[in-house]
Amino acid sequence: MANHRIDRVGMEIKREVNDILQKKVRDPRVQGVTITEVQMQGDLSLAKVYYTIMSDLASDNQKAQTGLEKATGTIKRELGKQLTMYKIPDLVFEKDNSIAYGNKIDQLLRDLDNKS
């Protein structure tokens, strides 16, 4: 039963953080950032927020990470306004490499298909 609550809170945080990034955060470094997944710690005190960015450049990835870290306070404050929780979890932002990995696999499969 508790796992359902953890999953629901994670989904709600994902939706709200995406909304906050689009509407409230004006930092150009976080433009184009999309939240892909939120993993909650069992006691709901920590949320690992995985994000992706359209650009593959390392400098853009670093800028996005820095921008998200700087905006953490704003995001957490806005989450406090939107969520009915006793304590808003601490946010840790990590780059989600699964999309790039999937694109790499897709490219390898296309290359194999073209060779045969």
Curated annotation (Swiss-Prot):
InterPro entries for the chain: KH_dom-like_a/b (IPR015946), RbfA (IPR000238), RbfA_dom_sf (IPR023799), Ribosome-bd_factorA_CS (IPR020053)
UniProt KW Cytoplasm keyword: yes
A Gene Ontology BP annotation from the UniProt entry: maturation of SSU-rRNA
Statement: the UniProt record of this protein carries the keyword Cytoplasm: yes
Domain of life according to the entry: Bacteria
Record-linked Gene3D superfamilies: 3.30.300.20
Pfam families: RBFA
A single GO molecular function term of this UniProt record: ribosomal small subunit binding
GO terms for cellular component: cytosol
Cysteine pairings via disulfide bonds: none
Keyword annotations of the record: Cytoplasm, Ribosome biogenesis
Subcellular location: Cytoplasm
Signal sequence region: none
Subunit text: Monomer. Binds 30S ribosomal subunits, but not 50S ribosomal subunits or 70S ribosomes.
Entry similarity comment: Belongs to the RbfA family.
Biological role stated in the UniProt entry: One of several proteins that assist in the late maturation steps of the functional core of the 30S ribosomal subunit. Associates with free 30S ribosomal subunits (but not with 30S subunits that are part of 70S ribosomes or polysomes). Required for efficient processing of 16S rRNA. May interact with the 5'-terminal helix region of 16S rRNA.
Protein name: Ribosome-binding factor A
Organism: Streptococcus pyogenes serotype M3 (strain ATCC BAA-595 / MGAS315)
